[in-house]
Amino acid sequence: MGIVCKGFDGVLTEYDWAQMSGLMGNMPSVKGPDDFRVGTTIQGSTVLCEVLPGQAWAHGVMCTSNSVETVTGQLPGPGETRYDYVVLSRDWEQNTAKLEIVPGGRAERARDVLRAEPGVYHQQLLATLVLSSNGLQQQLDR
């Protein structure tokens, strides 16, 4: 089914509001410790991140996933180390959300790489991946 979001333009039911109100207060947040948890494996030069189902909240939009979602990226070139970010991106113009891996740089600088424009486009950090051409060096969860 993918990711369904409430809080963009459209109908919001009492049930939706009850679910959302329990997540308010911490920005951004997830409902439980395993919600949107990221598991990472490497196959050749491909980075595979499986994101568990759950609920996530940020800036008035609650996203619910009821199945494991997979996003992919690539390892950096030989001799390089790179910080990449697994994020839940919300797009208010398209009224959509998606999971993606955002390539970073040689140092942990999520605030300089991720978009944070609530009401326009926002990327909620789920995990930081420290990658080298040899594979996953470290994963830092939210």
Give, region by region, the residue ranges found by the protein language model.
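N-terminal alpha-helical "arm" segments
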Residues: 1-42
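Beta-strand-rich solenoidal segments
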Residues: 3-15, 48-142
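Intrinsically disordered, low-complexity segments enriched in polar/charged residues with Gly/Pro
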Residues: 26-27, 34-36, 41-44, 49, ...
